[in-house]
Amino acid sequence: ALVQALIRHAQDEDLSSLHLLFAQDRDVQACADAGLMLRHTVQFHWHNRSYRDFGHFLSDLQQEKRKKIRQERRKVTEAGIRFRHSMGQDITDADWGFFYQCYERTYLEHGNPPYLNRDFFARLARVMPQQWLLFVAERDGIPVASSLIALDPERGVAYGRYWGALERVDCLHFEACYYQPLEWCIAHGFQRFEGGAQGEHKMARALMPVRTTSVHWLAHPAFAEAVERFLERETDGIGGYLDQLAERSPLRHGHAG
Protein backbone atom coordinates (compact mmCIF):
# COMPACT_ATOMS: atom_id res chain seq x y z
CA ALA A 1 0.00 0.00 0.00
CA LEU A 2 2.81 2.40 0.86
CA VAL A 3 4.60 1.70 -2.42
CA GLN A 4 1.44 2.33 -4.44
CA ALA A 5 0.86 5.55 -2.48
CA LEU A 6 4.38 6.72 -3.37
CA ILE A 7 3.76 6.01 -7.05
CA ARG A 8 0.45 7.88 -6.97
CA HIS A 9 2.17 10.82 -5.27
CA ALA A 10 4.89 10.84 -7.94
CA GLN A 11 2.26 10.79 -10.67
CA ASP A 12 0.23 13.56 -9.01
CA GLU A 13 3.35 15.71 -8.71
CA ASP A 14 4.41 14.89 -12.28
CA LEU A 15 7.72 13.43 -11.08
CA SER A 16 9.84 11.58 -13.61
CA SER A 17 11.09 8.85 -11.29
CA LEU A 18 11.36 7.31 -7.83
CA HIS A 19 14.49 5.64 -6.44
CA LEU A 20 15.10 3.64 -3.27
CA LEU A 21 18.72 3.02 -2.32
CA PHE A 22 20.23 0.88 0.46
CA ALA A 23 16.84 -0.45 1.49
CA GLN A 24 16.08 -3.26 3.91
CA ASP A 25 15.32 -6.63 2.30
CA ARG A 26 11.65 -6.49 3.27
CA ASP A 27 11.26 -3.10 1.59
CA VAL A 28 12.97 -4.33 -1.57
CA GLN A 29 10.60 -7.30 -1.66
CA ALA A 30 7.55 -5.06 -1.20
CA CYS A 31 8.70 -2.91 -4.12
CA ALA A 32 9.36 -5.96 -6.28
CA ASP A 33 5.89 -7.29 -5.48
CA ALA A 34 4.50 -3.93 -6.61
CA GLY A 35 6.24 -4.27 -9.96
CA LEU A 36 9.09 -1.79 -9.50
CA MET A 37 12.44 -2.41 -11.19
CA LEU A 38 15.36 -3.82 -9.22
CA ARG A 39 18.99 -3.11 -9.98
CA HIS A 40 21.73 -5.35 -8.58
CA THR A 41 25.23 -3.96 -8.14
CA VAL A 42 28.34 -4.84 -6.14
CA GLN A 43 29.90 -3.13 -3.14
CA PHE A 44 32.85 -4.19 -1.01
CA HIS A 45 32.36 -4.81 2.71
CA TRP A 46 34.65 -6.02 5.50
CA HIS A 47 33.23 -8.48 8.01
CA ASN A 48 34.51 -8.95 11.54
CA ARG A 49 35.10 -12.66 12.13
CA SER A 50 35.44 -12.25 15.90
CA TYR A 51 38.96 -10.88 15.51
CA ARG A 52 40.83 -10.21 18.76
CA ASP A 53 43.00 -7.50 17.25
CA PHE A 54 44.45 -6.31 13.94
CA GLY A 55 47.13 -9.00 14.02
CA HIS A 56 44.46 -11.67 14.35
CA PHE A 57 42.70 -10.16 11.33
CA LEU A 58 45.94 -10.23 9.32
CA SER A 59 46.39 -13.91 10.14
CA ASP A 60 43.17 -14.56 8.21
CA LEU A 61 44.76 -13.24 5.00
CA GLN A 62 47.00 -14.90 2.47
CA GLN A 63 50.69 -14.39 3.20
CA GLU A 64 51.23 -12.02 0.27
CA LYS A 65 48.35 -9.78 1.38
CA ARG A 66 49.56 -9.74 5.00
CA LYS A 67 53.03 -8.69 3.90
CA LYS A 68 51.66 -5.92 1.67
CA ILE A 69 49.51 -4.43 4.44
CA ARG A 70 52.38 -4.51 6.95
CA GLN A 71 54.62 -2.74 4.42
CA GLU A 72 52.01 -0.05 3.79
CA ARG A 73 51.47 0.58 7.50
CA ARG A 74 55.22 0.70 8.11
CA LYS A 75 55.68 3.38 5.43
CA VAL A 76 53.16 5.62 7.18
CA THR A 77 54.76 5.11 10.59
CA GLU A 78 58.25 5.73 9.21
CA ALA A 79 56.99 8.98 7.67
CA GLY A 80 56.37 10.19 11.23
CA ILE A 81 52.59 9.99 11.01
CA ARG A 82 50.56 9.30 14.13
CA PHE A 83 46.79 9.01 14.36
CA ARG A 84 44.24 10.12 16.89
CA HIS A 85 40.51 9.63 16.72
CA SER A 86 37.51 11.38 18.21
CA MET A 87 33.88 10.37 18.36
CA GLY A 88 30.63 12.25 18.80
CA GLN A 89 30.76 15.35 20.94
CA ASP A 90 34.50 14.85 21.51
CA ILE A 91 35.08 16.04 17.93
CA THR A 92 35.99 19.69 18.42
CA ASP A 93 35.05 22.60 16.18
CA ALA A 94 38.72 22.84 15.23
CA ASP A 95 38.72 19.18 14.18
CA TRP A 96 35.58 19.67 12.08
CA GLY A 97 37.20 22.71 10.50
CA PHE A 98 40.36 20.78 9.65
CA PHE A 99 38.33 17.89 8.29
CA TYR A 100 36.47 20.26 5.98
CA GLN A 101 39.79 21.59 4.67
CA CYS A 102 40.74 18.02 3.78
CA TYR A 103 37.33 17.24 2.30
CA GLU A 104 37.42 20.40 0.19
CA ARG A 105 40.96 19.69 -1.01
CA THR A 106 39.97 16.24 -2.29
CA TYR A 107 37.32 17.72 -4.59
CA LEU A 108 39.40 20.68 -5.73
CA GLU A 109 42.27 18.37 -6.70
CA HIS A 110 39.86 16.67 -9.10
CA GLY A 111 38.69 19.97 -10.53
CA ASN A 112 35.31 19.98 -8.78
CA PRO A 113 33.82 22.15 -6.06
CA PRO A 114 32.76 20.24 -2.92
CA TYR A 115 29.06 19.46 -3.07
CA LEU A 116 28.60 19.71 0.72
CA ASN A 117 29.36 22.94 2.53
CA ARG A 118 30.86 23.54 5.97
CA ASP A 119 27.45 24.26 7.48
CA PHE A 120 26.22 20.81 6.48
CA PHE A 121 28.85 19.13 8.64
CA ALA A 122 28.24 21.60 11.47
CA ARG A 123 24.59 20.52 11.47
CA LEU A 124 25.57 16.86 11.52
CA ALA A 125 27.75 17.51 14.53
CA ARG A 126 24.83 19.14 16.36
CA VAL A 127 21.96 16.87 15.34
CA MET A 128 23.55 13.40 15.31
CA PRO A 129 26.98 13.62 16.96
CA GLN A 130 27.20 9.98 18.06
CA GLN A 131 27.04 8.78 14.46
CA TRP A 132 30.47 10.17 13.54
CA LEU A 133 34.03 9.00 14.06
CA LEU A 134 36.90 11.21 12.92
CA PHE A 135 40.49 10.08 12.38
CA VAL A 136 43.17 12.76 12.20
CA ALA A 137 46.70 12.02 10.99
CA GLU A 138 49.39 14.21 12.50
CA ARG A 139 53.10 14.73 12.00
CA ASP A 140 54.90 16.40 14.90
CA GLY A 141 51.53 17.39 16.31
CA ILE A 142 50.43 19.13 13.10
CA PRO A 143 47.37 17.65 11.33
CA VAL A 144 48.00 16.58 7.75
CA ALA A 145 45.02 14.36 6.83
CA SER A 146 41.68 13.09 8.11
CA SER A 147 38.93 10.59 7.39
CA LEU A 148 35.31 10.71 8.53
CA ILE A 149 33.43 7.50 9.30
CA ALA A 150 29.67 7.21 9.80
CA LEU A 151 28.49 4.81 12.52
CA ASP A 152 25.38 2.75 13.11
CA PRO A 153 25.97 1.59 16.70
CA GLU A 154 22.75 -0.42 16.89
CA ARG A 155 23.68 -2.61 13.92
CA GLY A 156 27.42 -2.49 14.55
CA VAL A 157 28.18 -1.10 11.10
CA ALA A 158 30.69 1.59 10.11
CA TYR A 159 30.66 3.39 6.78
CA GLY A 160 33.70 4.94 5.13
CA ARG A 161 32.59 8.34 3.90
CA TYR A 162 35.09 11.13 3.29
CA TRP A 163 38.80 11.66 3.41
CA GLY A 164 41.40 14.21 2.41
CA ALA A 165 45.02 15.21 2.96
CA LEU A 166 46.87 18.51 2.90
CA GLU A 167 50.12 16.82 1.91
CA ARG A 168 51.05 13.63 0.13
CA VAL A 169 52.38 10.73 2.18
CA ASP A 170 52.86 7.30 0.62
CA CYS A 171 50.12 4.85 1.68
CA LEU A 172 48.44 7.40 3.96
CA HIS A 173 45.12 6.95 2.15
CA PHE A 174 45.09 3.21 2.93
CA GLU A 175 45.92 3.83 6.58
CA ALA A 176 43.34 6.58 7.08
CA CYS A 177 40.51 5.00 5.11
CA TYR A 178 40.96 1.29 5.83
CA TYR A 179 43.45 0.20 8.47
CA GLN A 180 42.62 2.74 11.17
CA PRO A 181 38.83 2.21 10.79
CA LEU A 182 39.22 -1.58 10.70
CA GLU A 183 41.38 -1.52 13.81
CA TRP A 184 38.74 0.61 15.53
CA CYS A 185 35.93 -1.72 14.44
CA ILE A 186 37.76 -4.72 15.87
CA ALA A 187 38.45 -2.94 19.17
CA HIS A 188 34.82 -1.83 19.54
CA GLY A 189 33.10 -5.00 18.34
CA PHE A 190 31.63 -3.54 15.15
CA GLN A 191 30.64 -6.30 12.76
CA ARG A 192 30.89 -4.67 9.36
CA PHE A 193 32.74 -1.88 7.57
CA GLU A 194 31.38 -0.65 4.25
CA GLY A 195 34.00 1.11 2.19
CA GLY A 196 31.66 2.72 -0.33
CA ALA A 197 30.89 2.05 -3.97
CA GLN A 198 33.23 0.60 -6.59
CA GLY A 199 36.83 -0.39 -6.17
CA GLU A 200 37.98 -3.96 -6.71
CA HIS A 201 41.27 -2.79 -5.16
CA LYS A 202 39.48 -2.89 -1.80
CA MET A 203 39.63 -6.68 -1.90
CA ALA A 204 43.35 -6.45 -1.12
CA ARG A 205 42.27 -5.01 2.25
CA ALA A 206 39.77 -7.86 2.81
CA LEU A 207 36.69 -5.88 1.79
CA MET A 208 34.73 -8.60 0.05
CA PRO A 209 32.18 -8.29 -2.79
CA VAL A 210 28.54 -8.13 -1.72
CA ARG A 211 25.47 -7.91 -3.94
CA THR A 212 23.40 -4.80 -3.23
CA THR A 213 19.96 -3.92 -4.59
CA SER A 214 18.27 -0.63 -5.43
CA VAL A 215 14.67 -0.02 -6.55
CA HIS A 216 13.51 2.25 -9.38
CA TRP A 217 10.27 3.51 -10.92
CA LEU A 218 10.21 5.56 -14.14
CA ALA A 219 7.16 7.49 -15.25
CA HIS A 220 7.77 7.32 -19.00
CA PRO A 221 6.57 3.86 -20.19
CA ALA A 222 8.93 3.52 -23.17
CA PHE A 223 11.93 4.69 -21.14
CA ALA A 224 10.99 2.31 -18.31
CA GLU A 225 10.74 -0.59 -20.76
CA ALA A 226 14.17 0.16 -22.23
CA VAL A 227 15.77 0.42 -18.78
CA GLU A 228 14.11 -2.81 -17.67
CA ARG A 229 15.59 -4.67 -20.65
CA PHE A 230 19.02 -3.29 -19.79
CA LEU A 231 18.67 -4.32 -16.15
CA GLU A 232 17.79 -7.87 -17.16
CA ARG A 233 21.03 -8.13 -19.14
CA GLU A 234 23.03 -6.44 -16.40
CA THR A 235 21.64 -8.77 -13.72
CA ASP A 236 22.70 -11.81 -15.76
CA GLY A 237 26.27 -10.49 -15.68
CA ILE A 238 26.39 -9.65 -11.98
CA GLY A 239 26.32 -13.30 -10.91
CA GLY A 240 29.29 -14.13 -13.11
CA TYR A 241 31.15 -11.06 -11.90
CA LEU A 242 30.68 -12.09 -8.27
CA ASP A 243 31.94 -15.59 -9.08
CA GLN A 244 35.07 -14.11 -10.67
CA LEU A 245 35.72 -11.91 -7.65
CA ALA A 246 35.25 -14.84 -5.25
CA GLU A 247 38.11 -16.63 -7.01
CA ARG A 248 40.39 -13.70 -6.08
CA SER A 249 39.61 -13.75 -2.37
CA PRO A 250 42.51 -12.50 -0.22
CA LEU A 251 41.38 -14.71 2.66
CA ARG A 252 43.43 -17.82 3.36
CA HIS A 253 40.53 -20.20 2.95
CA GLY A 254 38.67 -18.14 0.36
CA HIS A 255 35.63 -17.73 2.58
CA ALA A 256 33.45 -14.74 1.75
CA GLY A 257 31.35 -12.46 3.89
Language model features with spans:
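Conserved acetyl-CoA-binding loop-helix of GNAT-fold acetyltransferases
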Residues: A1-R8, R168-C185, E194
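Conserved GNAT acetyl-CoA-binding A-motif
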Residues: E13-L21, C185-A197
